[in-house]
Amino acid sequence: MRIGIIGLGRMGGNIAVRLTRHGHDVVVHDRTSEVTTSVVGRCEAGRATPADTLADMAKLLEGDEHRVVWVMLPAGAITEDCVQQLGGLLGRGDIIIDGGNTYYKDDVRRSAELAEKGISYVDVGTSGGVWGLERGYCMMFGGTKETAEYIDPILSALAPGIGDVPRTPGRDEAGHDPRAEQGYLHCGPAGSGHFVKMVHNGIEYGMMQAFAEGFDIMKSKNSPILAEKDRFELNMGDIAEVWRRGSVVSSWLLDLTAEALTRSETLNEFSGEVADSGEGRWTIEAAIEEDVPAPVMTAALFTRFRSRSGNNFAEKILSAQRFGFGGHVEKK
């Protein structure tokens, strides 16, 4: 199968490479031509074609039963502009996929607008960060059933597969989507994929914050505000490591935390000023709309706000985790 990919950053480029490794062909475009050239060079030989412009990409994809274009750009105006341009370049039967972190209500609107032109729209919440090339991507997507079936070869190639994760008892019973244990899921109509990914990221905020606070408490057990007899000098890297081995809180986030603390007990390479990319805010907005209490996620989001006005070790833990799973660097 052939697909166009727009935006070849940390995830978009790796998505292109992974698809070619699984026998698919890609037409790739990035606003920086050097990036496009680099990604083509990383792809399997003969399976990647560069496109200079969006119009060039649309032309190169002509002849396919349905032209499919995956947009992997930052949420907001840049993605909105790209989708609008594609809406004018593609036609009836073609498919636009937004694999970024778009606000789900924008997906609902775009889907309706594009449907008037006969263009299908799929929103894919994509998790996996810089590790997705080798591990695969966990994907939650929304769109019509027919479109989901057509792009299944693309999604199944990107997904991690069942791997060595134990199967959940009862999964063979009727009513369970077999794609879920392969690492990708058709959640429902347009907007539902990004909605589920939005909540996923809200949960991520809470989990990260719990680790950050816990390590901060342990580090501060040697604080001068305590009487000397009450102090413990604890090794953060060793504690993170032992927790990885069979504890209830073992997880990928803990793995990344252990790596960071093994490299540097103080995490002084991080300022502790923690960004938020929008999904946490949208999750809280959804909770308010639904009258659902979400105190943990709300506190985690507000802590990120606080981090930008005063630094402490907890925020350095968060920065280290974000760098570990997504290659996110702190804003200077």
Curated annotation (Swiss-Prot):
Q: Write out the catalysed reaction.
A: 6-phospho-D-gluconate + NAD(+) = D-ribulose 5-phosphate + CO2 + NADH
Q: Which InterPro entries match?
A: 6-PGluconate_DH-like_C_sf, 6DGDH_YqeC, 6PGD_dom2, 6PGDH_C, 6PGDH_NADP-bd, NAD(P)-bd_dom_sf, Pgluconate_DH
Instruction: Tell me the GO molecular function terms.
Output: NADP binding; phosphogluconate dehydrogenase (decarboxylating) activity
Q: Which UniProt keywords apply?
A: Gluconate utilization, NAD, Oxidoreductase
The enzyme's first-digit EC class, named in words, is oxidoreductase
Residues of the active site: 197, 204
Reported function: Catalyzes the oxidative decarboxylation of 6-phosphogluconate to ribulose 5-phosphate and CO(2), with concomitant reduction of NAD to NADH.
- Relate the assembly described in the record: Homotetramer.
**Record protein name field:** 6-phosphogluconate dehydrogenase, NAD(+)-dependent, decarboxylating
Organism (species): Gluconobacter oxydans (strain 621H) (Gluconobacter suboxydans)
Organism placement in taxonomy: Bacteria, Pseudomonadati, Pseudomonadota, Alphaproteobacteria, Acetobacterales
